[in-house]
């Protein structure tokens, strides 16, 4: 949303916030930006969920790692993530994976439309999709970002390709 948000948008945002508080969600609110951050966890890790509402009846949900992608693996992992997004057959074109270089974090980002559902199912559906996408790749990215890469220096002894010309 922007500064020119309608009364309906403001009421909808406030109603969602109240619903989440009623469900005991711990929220860090930014009412001027129509956004909030909360902590999410599974049995393996904790991460942040950032939700930002926009003025065109859509919102963005980001699951963001609390662990850091190390500098030496940042570019390598970012390239791999871009390939995952390109070749992801299960994608519904609402959610993508990303590396935020500034924060050095792994993210799953979901764009969705704000609905008129009294039970806020539009939000919880996007939340479920986003956290499932995040969890599906998080362990792999975390492990890949902590390993060093070693290169084999091929010699005549360990090369799969013959080092000398073979005569017929």
Q: Which residue ranges define each predicted feature?
A:
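Charge-rich, low-complexity N-terminal segments
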Residues: 1-53
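Short amphipathic alpha-helical segments that mediate assembly, nucleic-acid/protein binding
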Residues: 10-13, 74-77, 120
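A short acidic/glycine-rich loop-to-helix N-cap element
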Residues: 114-128
